[in-house]
Swiss-Prot record:
Taxonomic classification: Eukaryota, Metazoa, Chordata, Craniata, Vertebrata
Protein name stated in the entry: Breast carcinoma-amplified sequence 1 homolog
Cellular component terms per the entry's GO annotation: cytoplasm; synapse
Biased composition (Low complexity): 166-185
Summary of the tissues where the protein is detected: Expressed in cerebral cortex and cerebellum, but not in other organs.
InterPro entries: NABC1
Compositional bias (Basic and acidic residues): 12-22, 198-207, 214-226, 243-254, 357-366, 418-438, 494-511
Ranges of biased composition (kind: Polar residues): 330-356, 532-545
Modified residues (Phosphoserine): 127, 192, 314, 381, 482, 557
Gene: Bcas1
């Protein structure tokens, strides 16, 4: 289109000097090419839309290209008044992006034009209006970048200036990415702002606020690019033959750059948005943690409240009931039972808080400091028949009460004393406490079982050792009761050693049997049980009737082991008549 209109103008203007000729060519190109730069810019921006956003919207292209064209037109109008001798601008409103300087082209500064980014897209499209005179396949077979640095032999006087024009036209291909980087990030962020509005991502609201300054930066960079070429001096001469082919190749290169370069800002945009997503997740996590911190002090307050409220209510409830101390325990169990039922009814949040309070309240106190809801239910239990409801609900809630009693031994002992005083009113509590007794000490029971296994061999070793010592000295009966006196103090330290000592006692059992075959005097059997009777009575007073038998066997095993060590060492040191007992005694050392 532009070529057909500019060709008839060229022969009429050839009468002028070559300078005026070159100025005329460039001015004619500008006058003819009214809408071409706008079209090319829309193509480039349309490729940005395709690569970055995947949307071909001409509505977005026109307002995006219009401020650029308006700025370029304003500067071009200001500079177009002094383009040359014969230059007469026809349509100033539709001038291209690039503009011509006042001075003649400086031959040494064609490479300085590379800083112009927005004008580069304009220069790429200016040339096709000239006449097709110098279409040399040798020069244009390759890319214009390859043809730019080496000046080929010129056929026309304007060819040197055309070479210099090709250099800034091709050299901006390298710095053209700043333009694309200035335009592309602003456009994806405009589009992503719509995405944020539709996706309702509150965490990314900071990004749209950042997009307007970046658009401002892009416009500033374009203005600087427009102002920059005025200093180094832009060549005016344009050879028609080269620029037709070069412009087509440059369009292709701009298209390829528009495919390749904006992809990087897109990645940059995604990488910029990724930390925002992370920040959004961190903000959500921080919000959840903040709610957790709000919830956890409430739990601690609810844990503290029952202690205060129950401490206030515990003396008042027996005053309302006008009963003995034993009547306080069914109320405690009723409070735990009813509060456990009531806590399941209101909702999940109170149930979670009350379960935690029930656990820690059970650790601190046995019954009364379990739940804050027990206050209300205790008032109901005062109005109702306390004993019947207590019996029914304790039958339902035996396991939690057992766990509470397992955790604290002292509270169970106190409640056992209370139930022994009045067992008729509280049969269920007695059952619960009797069941909690054997479960209370599983570790002690395990140690007792280990001690029971080795107790038989150890008692026999006691007898045999007593017999050996009676053979040696006549005061054996006096010596044998003497070591068990410090036994109760040493038993606490040696409960951990019982398992290892039981293994040794099995080895000593064979030696004890051999000694028993040699010496058949049952003299030392009596003093050891006599010494252990008071300890058995103390255990009976503390822990009841079931445990003292096992504890008696355990004490016998420890005492017998200590007794067995002393006389056998005496035998080994003095007489050494018993070779069988030397081996296990050496192991015990």
């Amino acid at each position: 289109m532009g070529n057909q209109m500019s060709v008839p103008l060229r022969p009429g203007d050839q009468e002028h000097d070559p300078e005026a000729d070159t100025y005329k060519v460039t001015s004619d190109n500008e006058c003819v090419q009214n809408g071409i730069p706008v079209v090319v810019s829309t193509r480039v921006i349309q490729h940005y839309e395709e690569v970055d956003l995947g949307i071909n919207s001409l509505k977005d292209n026109v307002p995006a290209s219009s401020p650029e064209t308006m700025e370029a037109h304003a500067v071009a109008d200001a500079s177009g008044k002094n383009l040359g001798k014969g230059s007469k601008p026809k349509a100033p409103a539709a001038r291209s992006h690039f503009f011509l300087t006042l001075s003649r082209p400086v031959p040494g500064r064609p490479g300085d034009q590379g800083t112009d980014s927005s004008a580069a897209s304009g220069r790429l499209d200016v040339s096709p209006g000239t006449a097709p005179e110098n279409k040399d396949p040798s020069e244009h077979g390759a890319l214009p970048v390859a043809a730019a640095p080496g000046p080929a032999p010129d056929k026309t006087p304007g060819c040197t200036e055309a070479k210099q024009q090709t250099l800034p036209a091709t050299s901006p291909l390298a710095p053209s990415p700043p333009e694309s980087q200035a335009e592309a990030p602003s456009r994806p962020k405009d589009f992503s702002f719509l995405n944020r509005l539709f996706k309702l991502d509150k965490g990314r609201e900071s990004a749209p606020a950042d997009s307007p300054p970046e658009e401002g930066k892009g416009s500033k960079s374009q203005e600087r690019a427009i102002e920059a070429p005025a200093v180094p001096g832009n060549p005016h001469g344009v050879s028609a033959g080269k620029d037709i082919v070069d412009s087509e190749e440059r369009k292709q290169e701009v298209d390829t750059l528009s495919y390749s370069v904006p992809a990087d800002p897109e990645v940059l945009g995604t990488t910029k948005e990724d930390p925002q997503v992370v920040d959004a997740t961190e903000n959500s996590n921080s919000i959840m943690s903040f709610f957790k911190t709000l919830v956890s002090p409430n739990k601690t307050e609810t844990k503290k409240d029952p202690e205060d409220t129950d401490a206030e209510n515990s003396p008042t409830t027996p005053a309302n009931l006008k009963s003995d101390k034993a009547d306080l325990t069914p109320q405690e169990t009723q409070g735990t039972a009813k509060s456990s039922k009531g806590s399941s009814q209101p909702g999940q949040a109170p149930s979670a808080g009350t379960s935690d309070t029930a656990r820690e309240g059970g650790k601190e106190k046995a019954g009364p400091t379990s739940l804050p809801l027990g206050k209300l239910f205790w008032k109901k239990s005062v109005k109702e028949d306390s004993l019947s409801t207590g019996a029914e609900e304790n039958a339902v809630c035996e396991p939690p009460v057992e766990t509470v009693r397992l955790e604290e031994v002292e509270s169970t002992l106190q409640t056992v004393d209370l139930t022994e005083k009045e067992t008729q009113t509280e049969p269920t509590d007695v059952k619960v406490k009797e069941e909690s007794k054997p479960r209370r000490t599983p570790l002690m029971a395990f140690l007792r079982q280990m001690s029971v296994r080795g107790s038989e061999g150890i008692t026999r070793s006691e007898e045999s050792n007593g017999k050996d010592s009676s053979c040696q000295t006549s005061n054996s009966t006096e010596k044998t009761p003497s070591p068990p006196e410090p036994e109760p103090a040493g038993t606490a330290q040696k409960n951990k050693e019982t398992s290892s000592k039981d293994k040794k006692s099995v080895d000593k059992k064979s030696a004890a049997e051999s000694n028993k075959q040699k010496n058949g005097k049952p003299e030392a059997r009596e003093p050891a049980p006599c010494v252990q009777q008071p300890t058995v009575e103390v255990n009976a007073l503390q822990t009841g009737d079931k445990t003292p038998k096992r504890s008696e066997k355990r004490r016998q095993s420890l005492g017998g082991f200590l007794k067995g060590l002393g006389p056998k060492r005496m035998l080994d040191a003095q007489v050494q008549t018993d070779p069988v007992s030397i081996g296990p005694v050496g192991k015990s050392k």
